[in-house]
Amino acid sequence: MSGNTLGQNFRVTTFGESHGIALGAIIDGCPPGMELSEEDIQIELDRRKPGTSKHATARREDDKVQILSGVFEGKTTGTPIGLLIHNTDQRSKDYSKVAETFRPAHADYTYTQKYGIRDYRGGGRSSARETAMRVAAGAVAKKYLKERLGIEIKGYLSQLGPITVDNVSWPFDNDNEYFCPDKDKQEEIRQYMDNLLKQKDSVGAKISIIAKNVPVGLGEPVFDRLDADLAHALMSINAVKGVEIGDGFAVAAQRGTEHRDEMTPEGFVSNHAGGILGGISTGQDIVAHIALKPTSSIMTPGRSINTEGEAIEMVTKGRHDPCVGIRATPIAEAKVALVLMDHFMRNRAQNGDVVPPVMDLAHPEN
């Protein structure tokens, strides 16, 4: 399995399985001298951890992170940062029947076909449990980006099933169990999820992410465009089936006179491009959206096969999120932070001495 590392100059490698002893991450390329504690990382992990809502998995994990290396006397040393989280609430017996069957719309079948073997307990490496380490690594990137560059990254639940959250403007409050900035919609979501649980079903969701104060110039054309790397990182999140940058798929219905982000001496007139042009950040807000599929781990019977290829009826038991999108916001924020951090490091390495010859249109007052 060779796809466990993200980034080039700021590299993150994760390891571990859902029901293994622990999850871990190695961060290579973090600049030295930044103050970093386990508490700094724990703040982000607590936003993601399971068991915080009746509409999320009932699995209880403290997700207490340990810093194993790369920090001395409270500051990063520039050496690899090792992070570890122990699993404490595995219930592998819930998955005993999954060993010889394939859950529909899960990675069970494809992992078996690719590797000839799989850890069936909780999905093993394919479980969203692994994203705890992405959030932990993202916390390090977030801290650096905010303290050194003033970059803020914040996401929110913009759709859950038929319920949409519209007209959200910065700053917004996402400090609730749904990461929803609209208090009225929070109650609507709560009622919808209660009914969904009674129906033994699940639902999809959409998450929106905004990154503010991103400097102009991040992105490496042509193959490592900033939007390409953001899409790659966000698509690697479990259950994500679509990524949009800026207006995304809505551009198919737009005309050029509407979509083009005109420029004046006072700055950009609009931001349909989502803060990226030609694969390079413009200095405007970077805006991205992800669509997450409904989990197929539900109590409603569905057709599948066993390892002998025989037809079976499958009911997935265990502790699962009826909407995986509810806890996806901190994960999406982390992935955006990791990409921006990597591209900042790459841009600094090559273009650190470049003085932009034209005014900063995103901040014309400067």
UniProtKB/Swiss-Prot annotation:
Cofactor (UniProt): FMNH2
Query: Which residues does NADP(+) bind?
Result: R48
- From the UniProt record, give the pathway where this protein acts: Metabolic intermediate biosynthesis; chorismate biosynthesis; chorismate from D-erythrose 4-phosphate and phosphoenolpyruvate: step 7/7
As its record notes, the protein acts as a catalyst of: 5-O-(1-carboxyvinyl)-3-phosphoshikimate = chorismate + phosphate
Q: Which CDD domains match?
A: Chorismate_synthase
Please tell me whether the keyword Metal-binding is annotated for this protein.
no
Give yes or no: UniProt keyword NADP.
Answer: yes
Single GO molecular function: FMN binding
Task: Report quaternary structure and partners.
Answer: Homotetramer.
| Protein name per its UniProtKB record | Chorismate synthase
Q: What species is given as this protein's source?
A: Hydrogenovibrio crunogenus (strain DSM 25203 / XCL-2) (Thiomicrospira crunogena)
